[in-house]
């Protein structure tokens, strides 16, 4: 169970759950695009990169990275409605990740982007994989930051049926909806999400400012989603970054083997372990993430 919460980082309040004011005017996208599920702002110039945050996260979890990248790349920072203080819109009910992936695909098409790179952290990684597998013609490169393609199998016993996973997801959703303010599991997991103390209040604020039903439904969707059968449809060069969860009861070698097995359906994917980092690699090891992203952009 502890393992599950960690990986769900973005699926948790984790993915950078920070509640932020509207972006400055110079960050606002000048591209006409309307959606009741996501919004996008742009920064910088150069090859296009779409950055997708995770559960309960604001796009500002990418701010430090964006500061370093905007001189070389044009960044498209996605915000999923319902998280970190934003009204849920169409995300008030039902699935969140799959519809968000479709909306990002529509954004790419309607704004005329030419197969941009897509980078997703935690739940954002799930969204990015959905987009790359279901619309491979739209994605030029793909980076998944600390997210397996089948979250449910990471915290259920080996051999569990899809129905058993769904029952677990139902239970977790009910728990999120019933939790008293400030006592939810996400808040309890924040210390294991980043080593940078100054970033933890951001994650707490994002979690507390998120729409409860949107969070619960998004988390449920992540648990029951298994993208392993779809990985072979991804044609873009792909990099997967992962960390060993703190206090993990699983030996490192076993965990590494599990991650590689999970991505066996994407044989061209480069699976990279990031040392000395918790779930928010963009906070704990930004230089390493940037180096891996630059390498991916050269592929």
Roles of regions detected by a PLM:
Residues 14-16:
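C-terminal motif of bacterial Sec signal peptides marking the signal peptidase cleavage site
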Residues 76-119, 123:
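Active-site loop/oxyanion-hole signature of alpha/beta-hydrolase fold enzymes
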Residues 142-176:
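Flexible "cap/lid" loop of the alpha/beta hydrolase fold
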Residues 277-286:
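Catalytic histidine-centered segment of alpha/beta-hydrolase-like enzymes
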């Amino acid at each position: 169970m502890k393992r599950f919460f960690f990986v769900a980082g973005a699926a948790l309040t984790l993915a950078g759950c920070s509640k932020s004011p509207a972006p400055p005017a110079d960050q606002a996208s000048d591209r006409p695009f309307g959606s009741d599920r996501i919004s996008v702002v742009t920064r910088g110039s150069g090859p296009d990169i779409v950055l997708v945050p995770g559960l309960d996260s604001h796009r500002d979890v990418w701010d430090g990275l964006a500061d370093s990248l905007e001189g070389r790349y044009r960044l498209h920072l996605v915000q999923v409605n319902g998280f970190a203080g934003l009204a849920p819109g169409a995300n008030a009910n039902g699935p969140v990740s799959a519809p968000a992936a479709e909306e990002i695909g529509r954004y790419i098409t309607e704004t005329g982007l030419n197969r941009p790179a897509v980078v997703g952290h935690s739940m954002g990684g799930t969204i990015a994989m959905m987009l790359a597998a279901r619309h491979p013609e739209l994605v030029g490169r793909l980076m998944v930051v600390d997210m397996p393609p089948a979250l449910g199998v990471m915290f259920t016993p080996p051999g569990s049926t899809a129905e058993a996973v769904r029952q677990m997801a139902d239970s977790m959703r009910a728990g999120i909806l019933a939790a008293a303010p400030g006592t939810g599991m996400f808040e309890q997991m924040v210390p294991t999400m980043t080593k940078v103390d100054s970033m933890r209040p951001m994650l707490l604020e994002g979690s507390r400012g998120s729409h409860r039903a949107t969070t619960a439904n998004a988390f449920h969707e992540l648990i029951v989603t298994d993208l392993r059968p779809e990985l072979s449809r991804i044609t873009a060069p792909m990099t997967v970054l992962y960390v060993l969860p703190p206090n993990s009861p699983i030996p490192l070698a076993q965990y590494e083997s599990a991650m590689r097995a999970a991505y066996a359906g994407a044989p061209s994917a480069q699976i990279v372990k990031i040392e000395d980092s918790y779930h928010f690699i963009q906070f704990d090891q930004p230089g390493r993430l940037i180096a891996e992203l630059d390498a991916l952009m050269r592929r």
